[in-house]
Regions:
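Cleavable N-terminal targeting peptides that direct proteins into the secretory/outer-membrane pathway or into
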Residues: 1-31
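Acidic, small-polar-rich N-terminal luminal/periplasmic segments of exported/outer-membrane proteins
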Residues: 33-181
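Short, solvent-exposed beta-strand-terminating loops
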Residues: 39-53, 259, 325, 329-339
Length: 359
């Protein structure tokens, strides 16, 4: 009886092992298989009111998707500029949306302490639709800008070599141009302490195939800023005329802006203070005035720009382009100075000089 039970137990164990081995073989065979090709068709919808754009201008590399470019680029739309606007800091507030860009605490668009990746960057380095030397150090109007492209890092291949080009990166202003759908926007805004601005943005395309387009942006502003004792008033006009067909693109941009700025804040200079004698430490924050400049300090400018460009397709994979521009600037009023720290109490001196041809 015991022999029969032992034989039955051995047979049961062998059958279980065989079944397990067979099941394992079957499982291994099912782990590897190949599906037939699957094609997925879809259409990307264009969103409106976005903060960033999908495309950017890349100089010699042409235009392209920002996700496919060999450089670090972020392309901000005019929505970013609108939502970042503060009097005298519109451009700076928008630029610092990029984590590679830093701005000094007392900077304004006129008095810039800008850095890209820790390296100093001047507003003279800003490109206008890929052309250097068209932007001056001033309170930058942003109402005519359709995209603001910021490239961080080496950029000579993309931007070319400007007279004062920074190795840290560059900023490119892309002007608005007429779109397929006509637009007319009239805006009035109030900000800070009695600071008013009024603007118009009109664009339309013409021709049998809408090959011609015109975009007009104009703005006037006047009032006090958030800085104590500072006020400014100015106006601007930018007109962009373009032509586009299957083989070519051409455009001509005219820009004019002028501004009078009284009491523009300056940064307190501590580097040249008499350290170790009259100055031994930084003064307490509450002992320093909010604005070192008097209300009658003056900084006024007039800025004109003319920009012509043409792009021609010579073949499926070959395109040539040419761009040329002229910029004229004038400072009819310049009465300002840098404040120098004198002692631990926060006293400072100003040696104001300059001239004015304004009436």
């Amino acid at each position: 009886m015991k022999k029969k039970q032992l034989t039955a137990a051995i047979m049961t164990a062998l059958m279980t092992m065989s079944a397990s081995a067979y099941a394992a073989e079957q499982t291994t065979a099912m782990d590897s298989y190949e599906l037939a090709p699957v094609d997925v068709a879809g259409q990307r919808t264009t969103e409106t009111g976005t903060m960033t754009a999908e495309t950017a201008s890349l100089g010699a590399l042409g235009g392209g998707n920002v996700l496919e470019t060999p450089v670090n680029v972020i392309s901000y739309t005019d929505e970013t500029l609108k939502k970042s606007f503060v009097p005298t800091r519109g451009f700076l507030n928008a630029a610092t949306n990029n984590p590679s860009v830093m701005v000094g605490g007392a900077s304004t668009d006129n008095n810039v302490e800008l850095q890209i990746r820790g390296i100093e960057f001047n507003t003279h380095d800003i490109l206008l639709d890929g052309v250097p030397g068209m932007i001056m150090m001033q309170n930058q109007p942003t109402n005519y800008i359709g995209r603001m492209e910021i490239i961080a890092g080496p950029n000579a291949v993309v931007s070319g070599i400007g007279l004062q080009q920074s190795a840290s990166g560059f900023v490119n202003f892309v002007p608005k141009k007429a779109e397929a759908k006509p637009n007319l926007d009239i805006t009035t805004s109030y900000a800070s302490s009695r600071y008013f601005s009024h603007g118009i943005d009109w664009g339309q395309r013409f021709g049998k195939n809408q090959e011609w387009g015109i975009r007009v942006n104009a703005e006037t502003h006047n009032g006090h800023t958030t800085m104590s004792g500072e006020d400014l008033h100015g106006r601007d006009l930018y007109v962009n005329i373009d032509h586009e067909d299957a083989k070519s693109k051409s455009s001509f941009l005219y820009g004019y802006d002028t501004e009078v700025n009284h009491g523009m804040p300056e940064v307190l200079r501590i580097k040249d203070a008499n350290w170790g004698t009259s100055v031994t430490r930084l003064p307490a924050a509450n002992s320093v005035v909010k604005n070192f400049m008097p209300r009658w300090a003056l900084l006024s400018h007039t800025h004109r720009v003319y920009l012509l460009q043409h792009e021609q397709k010579l073949g499926r994979h070959l395109t040539v382009y040419a761009k040329a521009g002229i910029m004229h600037r004038d400072w009819p009023g310049y009465i300002t100075a840098k404040p120098f720290l004198q002692n631990d109490a926060g006293d400072y001196t100003l040696d104001i000089s300059g001239s004015s041809t304004m009436g």
